[in-house]
Amino acid sequence: MITLSAEQCRIIGVMLEKETTTPEQYPLSLNGITTGCNQKSNRDPVMSLSESDVQNLVDELVQMNQLMVDQKASTRVNKYFHRFCDTEFGNLKFTPQQRAVICVLFLRGPQTPGELRTRTNRLADFADVSEVDNTLTQLQDLNGLTLVRKLEREPGKRESRYVHLLSDVDESSFTQAVTTQTEVVLSEEQTSLTQRVTELEQQVASLTEQINCITELLNDD
């Protein structure tokens, strides 16, 4: 199974997305790939790759047989199509639903089944979240390949997220990020509670002092 960098995943995700949503613009030029990579909507994280960065990444993917130059293009500008999946001699054969899930995981990072159902709406049809669950189960053992994995559920969340396993990104970083967020929340809550206790202690001390003063006045009378 191939291992891709986060930037290479972004490029292939863009190719998969545009092939389905704007087939009239596919194969893509270098400019089209760059624009798709740096798109602010439907991307996480948002990237700022230069055209030269993208050219280097495209060249790497061509060497890996994941992209090819379209020799049939009638323009002077090179256009590229992917060979990542669903090719005659490739190992990865996806259903439209499996392909849509992988595409969104490439473009947006870890997702819950509910998020995947919403965010694949232009790529494939899912009747309900259970169909997404079934697709994720299939991708966990697709012809002997484990392409996605379920992450630990985040505190306060109803669903666990899933991450694809075709990247060299460390999965533990997602768990660490969740742990850090939880620690920050707990720290903020603890600080707020401490401040509240201090305020109450000050109020009690003030009331006690007032009561003592009143008691002294009554005793003097």
Swiss-Prot record:
Pfam families: DUF480
Coiled coil: none
Family membership: Belongs to the UPF0502 family.
Protein name according to UniProt: UPF0502 protein CPS_0106
Organism encoding this protein: Colwellia psychrerythraea (strain 34H / ATCC BAA-681)
Biological classification of the source: Bacteria, Pseudomonadati, Pseudomonadota, Gammaproteobacteria, Alteromonadales
